[in-house]
Amino acid sequence: MEYRKFGDTYIVRMDRDEEILAQLKIFAEKEQVKLASVTALGAVKDFTIGVFDTSAKAYHSNRFQGVYEIVSLVGTINTKDGDFYCLLFTF
């Protein structure tokens, strides 16, 4: 992962086979980013997504094998009780 800061904006580039959530957490902790919006595009390989079932009030995960293009990924970086976490959504 590489990143650069331009004013109050960071541009982050992930390397192939890096896990998006793990790398964003490392970045946020290192730079002390406690609240941010995230937008991204690119490609992923072999990934898991979670779908929230509103009736059961539970997440179900789906695993995908292969290479897929990310046309739009949006989300946030947040903190809760001092811990960094991300919520990411793709369309």
Model-derived regions, located:
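N-terminal intrinsically disordered, cationic/polar leader segments
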Residues: 1-91
